[in-house]
């Protein structure tokens, strides 16, 4: 696209044409993972050329001429009109949460920004927490929005921010962000709501998120409202189309009809790359695609908090009892075999639950608990046997032949 249409950012006339083409192809919804924070300074020559043919410019001063050129070549107006006419566009915006380590953010949301975001709140909200309850939701501190003309024209807006962990990997997305009494959904959820036209609802309890659903589909989140992303593969797992091919008519109704379309940068230098579990340089727009596909297909990864601790305790208890019984009747190599069987058996079950059932259970704790139990029994048994051998050697070495003493140490019974 950059090779065909020139460097980024493009004139807004291109973006207007892109919306018209995608909307005309019958797309279900169009989401822009792109921020348009400033007015476009580009004046399209073709628009001015057409307008000159219709206006007498013989008696016009320079100031009036510049104002007239801006009016006829107002690419922002053209883009806003395309967004409004489409009735399918969702715009993204960036947020900084409290405690964000990406920079020192002192700015707060202005009254104008709050007014711009007002229509993008959760449509249905039930709160069972009390004033003063410290509900563990992520709090929005400031935001970066597109210019008001675009936000007003869009069907909806949603934040495109993720939750990067200490290793920099994006595994979670906040499904709810709070600002005062207002609750806001993310970009991906807003797109899905627009595509399905189903009601979006959230229920807040004193401990955090109690329920979040679109229509009758309930989405699993943590108490703070974070959703664990189920990645389908490395970068470019989803179908990518060049924007220039859409603008040139090479991609149209056949490819785009009834599809959820995300528009974003994937070229080097656009700076919208994340680190995913599959590695770095993962296009941010494709992270949103994974989230939307998760929600559409209900491919959730669930952490079963209700019985997870019972499973860990059960593994430790059962492995301890079994290894303890084996240590009484069998040699160390039998214990080692039992340990390997237990570890690889658990890893197999763990892998099956994760890949086939979407259940995320602890891997490290149960495996290491078996190793620690085995190590403890082995050390205890070795110490006990050594003490018994010393006793036999001291008690019988003066009265029996060395060969007989060795036989007694090998078989104390």
Model-inferred region functions:
Residues 294-403:
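Transmembrane alpha-helices and their extracellular/periplasmic helix-loop junctions
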Residues 413:
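Catalytic NTP-binding/metal-coordinating core of nucleotidyl cyclase/transferase enzymes
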Residues 36, 227, 231, 241, ...:
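Aromatic side chains
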Residues 127-131, 147, 214-227, 355-362, ...:
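Short low-complexity stretches enriched in small and charged residues
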Residues 407-410:
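P-loop NTPase nucleotide-binding/switch module
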Residues 1-218, 222, 256-334:
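Non-transmembrane functional regions of envelope-associated proteins
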């Amino acid at each position: 696209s950059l090779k065909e249409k020139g460097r980024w950012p493009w004139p807004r006339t291109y973006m207007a044409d892109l919306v018209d083409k995608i909307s005309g192809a019958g797309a279900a919804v169009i989401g822009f993972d792109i921020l348009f924070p400033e007015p476009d300074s580009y004046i399209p020559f073709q628009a001015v050329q057409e307008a000159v043919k219709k206006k007498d410019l013989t008696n016009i001063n320079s100031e009036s001429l510049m104002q007239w050129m801006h009016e006829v070549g107002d690419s922002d107006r053209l883009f806003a009109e395309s967004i409004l006419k489409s009735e399918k566009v969702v715009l993204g915006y960036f947020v900084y949460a409290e405690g964000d380590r990406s920079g020192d953010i002192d700015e707060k949301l202005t009254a104008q920004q709050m007014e711009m975001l007002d229509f993008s709140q959760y449509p249905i909200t039930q709160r069972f927490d009390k004033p003063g309850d410290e509900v563990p939701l992520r709090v929005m501190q400031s935001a970066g929005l597109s210019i008001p003309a675009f936000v007003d024209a869009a069907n909806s807006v949603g934040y495109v921010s993720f939750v990067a962990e200490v290793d920099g990997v994006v595994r979670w997305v906040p499904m709810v962000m709070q600002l005062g009494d207002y609750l806001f959904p993310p970009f991906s959820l807003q797109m899905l709501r627009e595509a399905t036209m189903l009601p979006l609802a959230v229920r807040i309890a004193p401990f955090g998120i109690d329920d979040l659903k679109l229509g009758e589909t309930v989405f699993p989140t943590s108490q703070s409202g974070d959703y664990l992303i189920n990645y389908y593969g490395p970068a470019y797992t989803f179908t990518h189309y060049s924007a220039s091919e859409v603008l040139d008519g090479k991609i149209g109704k056949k490819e785009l009809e009834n599809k959820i379309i995300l528009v974003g940068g994937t070229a080097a230098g656009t700076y919208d790359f994340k680190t995913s579990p599959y590695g770095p340089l993962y296009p941010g727009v494709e992270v949103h695609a994974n989230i939307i596909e998760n929600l559409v297909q209900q491919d959730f990864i669930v952490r079963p908090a209700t019985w997870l601790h019972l499973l860990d305790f059960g593994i430790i208890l059962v492995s301890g009892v079994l290894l303890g019984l084996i240590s009484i009747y069998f040699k160390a190599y039998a214990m080692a075999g039992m340990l390997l069987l237990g570890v690889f058996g658990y890893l197999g079950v763990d892998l099956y639950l994760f890949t086939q059932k979407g259940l995320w259970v602890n891997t490290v704790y149960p495996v290491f608990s078996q190793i620690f139990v085995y190590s403890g029994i082995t050390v205890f048994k070795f110490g006990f046997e050594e003490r018994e051998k010393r006793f036999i050697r001291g008690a019988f070495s003066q009265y029996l032949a060395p060969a007989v003493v060795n036989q007694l140490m090998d078989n104390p019974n």
